[in-house]
């Protein structure tokens, strides 16, 4: 999985467990693609401080996933529902396809 996608998924699932400041910095640097220097200047800290905070956030998010496996479960369910959708399309089972579409959209 692409690193950005992995980080975004981890943040989607576990971001609320970070402090407000960590969330702000992580969103700015990782999701909004702001430079470390820009974020450091906005917060009045040094660039290294922002870098260290991002590293700590990545570690915390990875640790949550190692313990809870929510992203892994989500990806497995999504894969299974996609397979159901493929099978339903082959057998023209419109109702199954409709249900699987709803589930995929919710995921």
Residue ranges and their predicted role:
Residues 2-14:
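Short, Lys/Arg-enriched N-terminal segment that forms or immediately precedes the first helix
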Residues 9, 24-25, 83:
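Pre-recognition alpha-helix immediately N-terminal to the DNA-recognition helix
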Residues 20-32:
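Short amphipathic alpha helix immediately N-terminal
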Residues 29, 54, 61, 65:
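DNA major-groove recognition helix of helix-turn-helix
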Residues 38-43:
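Short alpha-helical "recognition helix" segments of helix-turn-helix
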Residues 46-47:
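Helix-turn-helix DNA-binding motif, specifically the short coil turn and the N-cap/start of the second
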Residues 79-107:
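Helix-turn-helix/homeodomain-like alpha-helical modules used for DNA recognition
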């Amino acid at each position: 999985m692409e690193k950005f996608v992995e980080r975004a998924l981890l943040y989607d699932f576990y971001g609320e467990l970070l402090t407000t400041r960590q969330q702000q910095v992580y969103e700015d640097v990782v999701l909004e693609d702001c430079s470390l220097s820009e974020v450091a200047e906005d917060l009045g800290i040094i660039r290294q401080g922002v870098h260290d905070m991002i590293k700590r956030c990545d570690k915390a998010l990875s640790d949550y996933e190692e313990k809870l496996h929510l992203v892994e479960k989500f990806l497995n369910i999504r894969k299974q529902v996609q397979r159901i959708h493929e099978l339903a399309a082959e057998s023209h089972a419109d109702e199954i396809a409709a249900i699987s579409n709803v589930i995929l959209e919710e995921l």
